[in-house]
Amino acid sequence: MGTSCIGSSEAIMLGTLAMKKRWQKKRKAEGKDWHNPNIVMNSAVQVCWEKAARYFDIEEKYSFCTSDRFVIDPEEAVALVDENTIGICAILGTTYTGEYEDVKKINDLLIKKGLDCPIHVDAASGGFVVPFVNPHLVWDFRLEKVVSINVSGHKYGLVYPGVGWVVWRSPEFLPQELVFNINYLVADQASFTLNFSKGASQIIGQYYQFLRLGKRGYRSIMLNLTRTADYLSAQLRFLGFIILSKGGGFGLPVVAFCLDPDNGQHFDEFAIAHQLRERGWVVPAYTMAPHSEKLKLMRVVVREDFSKSRCDQLVCDIKLALQVLGEMDKNAMESYQEYVQAITRELFHGNVLSLINGHILLIIL
C-alpha cells in the first residue's frame, strides 16, 4: 500500500513518521519508555532526512563518510542500533556521488544479530533506474527488513515536479491512527499526507508515462543515460580528473569527479564551476558530507535531454576552462577566486532580495 506525495521529501516524512509511531506503539505495549527515538543514517543523506528527524523529535545517529567511502558502512550502521532505534535509512543513489548503499548487507546483518529494526529505502533517484538497468540488485521488498520505500516521479520517473511516492510492505507497517478516512468528497477515501490541497496533473503525468513508455521504454531511456554517463566519465578521466561515482549501472547516471591533487593545480573545483557557468553550464561544485568535507568535487546529473553531442560540448568547455585557469599565475588566481566569491555572495543576496521583494509585492497586490 502507498500514497502519492509532492515529492520524496514528503514521502520521507511520512515513512519516518510511520516508523516512529510503530516503534512507540510497540514500546508502550511492552511498558517501556517511548520518549527517546533515534534513527540511523549516513551523514550524506539529503537534508529532508535531517528535517524529518528534527521536526518529529528523533535523535540522529550517523555513520560518517570517510575519505574513500561515501556511503553508509553496514557494520557501523547496525552497531548503532539500540532499543530506541525506529529504523535505518538506506539510500539508493546518494546526492553526493549517486552511489547505491548496500541494503542487502544491512538486512542480512540485522537478521544475523537478531535485531528487530526496520529499513526504509530512500530510492528518490534510484527507484526508477535500478529496476531497468540493474534488475538483479536486491534492495527492495525482497529483503525481509525493508518495510517502506520512497521514490521521486520528477527525477528519473520522467515527470515534471512535483510528485513522489511512498509504499509500505504491508498495511501493518502503516499505523492506522495516521490514516484519516473521509466521505465528504463523493466517496469514502483514506488520506495520509502532510500537504493539503494539490493538483492531480503530476499523478496523471506519471500514469501517462507508465502507459506510453512501459518497461521497455524506461529500460531503453535509463540504459542510454547510463551509457552517456559512462562516456562522460571516460572523457573526464582522460582529462586527468578522478572519478568518484560508480559506472556501468552500479550507480545513478551521475558523474561525480574532482581534480587530482597530485597534479598540483593552483585552482580548485569552484573555479572550474564558475568558468563553466560563464559558458552556460550549471555544474555544481561542493564539499563532501561531514567528516570528509575537505574533499571538493563536482557533479553532472545526466538527464534524458543530455545527448552525446551535448556531452561532447561540455567536455570541450571543461577543456577550455582548464586552459584558461591553467594560464593564470598564483596571484592572478587568488584575485580571480576572490572575485568568484564576491560574485557568488552578490548573486545569493540578490536572489534572496528578489524573493523577499516578490513576496512583498504579492502581499501588496
Predicted regions and their residues:
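Short acidic, glycine/serine/threonine-rich loops at helix termini
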Residues: 15-17, 50-55, 99-102, 129-134, ...
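Secondary-structure transition/capping motifs at alpha-helix termini
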Residues: 22-34, 56-61, 69, 83-84, ...
